[in-house]
């Protein structure tokens, strides 16, 4: 799926399933999610244990092989340019980060992937979008509440937002 199609898919479906901490069964999970109407899946990197990164990239690759163009597959908890490259090499189509790291956003865009960095404040949201983000992940949205998201959308209605974290 090209970058435009991935962005359009996320915009239309408004849901990205987040998968964290599985040892196996990614292909079956992706098929079940697809059967339930989910069209985008994010497989997260474990920052505490880099030895699991091979498993994460393997899962991204396996889901891409299994689902083909039916489902957009991305990497989450991407905090470095190195992880952007690992995700891209595995076949990721989008990158999700917990923060706004401009180097990560630039590398993501250079590689032709959709960028979804995390931000919380209006200033961070604007900075992420100005740096090239396709969507800005408002995180932790569950802690902030739906009223916060509604309030942010008023003055920042030109920036595509994703509410993530305890939603």
Predicted features and spans:
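Conserved N-terminal beta1-alpha1 strand-loop-helix module at the mouth
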Residues: 1-90, 100, 110, 158
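Catalytic cores of alpha/beta
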Residues: 28-29, 80-90, 123-133, 148, ...
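Conserved beta-strand positions in the central sheet of alpha/beta enzyme cores
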Residues: 40-42, 74, 96, 116, ...
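Short, ordered loop/turn segments at secondary-structure junctions
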Residues: 45-48, 78, 99-102, 120-121, ...
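Short amphipathic alpha-helical segments and helix-helix/interface helices
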Residues: 60, 105, 149-150
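Short, glycine/charged-rich "phosphate-handling" switch motifs in NTP-dependent
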Residues: 93
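C-terminal helical cap(s) of enzyme catalytic domains, especially alpha/beta-barrels
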Residues: 107-114
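Active-site/ligand-binding-proximal alpha/beta "capping" segment
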Residues: 135-167
């Amino acid at each position: 799926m090209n970058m435009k199609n991935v962005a359009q898919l996320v915009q239309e479906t408004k849901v990205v399933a987040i998968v964290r901490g599985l040892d196996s069964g990614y292909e079956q999970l992706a098929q079940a999610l697809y059967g339930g109407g989910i069209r985008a899946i994010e497989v997260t990197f474990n920052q505490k244990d880099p030895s699991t990164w091979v498993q994460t990239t393997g899962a991204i690759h396996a889901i891409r092989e299994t689902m083909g163009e039916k489902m957009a597959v991305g990497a989450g908890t991407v905090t470095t340019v190195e992880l952007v490259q690992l995700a891209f090499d595995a076949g990721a189509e989008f990158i999700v980060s917990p923060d706004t790291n401009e180097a990560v956003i630039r590398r993501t865009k250079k590689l032709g992937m959709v960028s979804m960095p995390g931000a919380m404040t209006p200033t961070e949201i604007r900075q992420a979008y100005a740096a090239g983000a396709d969507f800005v992940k408002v995180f932790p949205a569950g802690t902030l509440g739906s009223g916060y998201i509604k309030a942010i959308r008023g003055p920042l209605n030109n920036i595509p937002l994703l509410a993530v974290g305890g939603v």
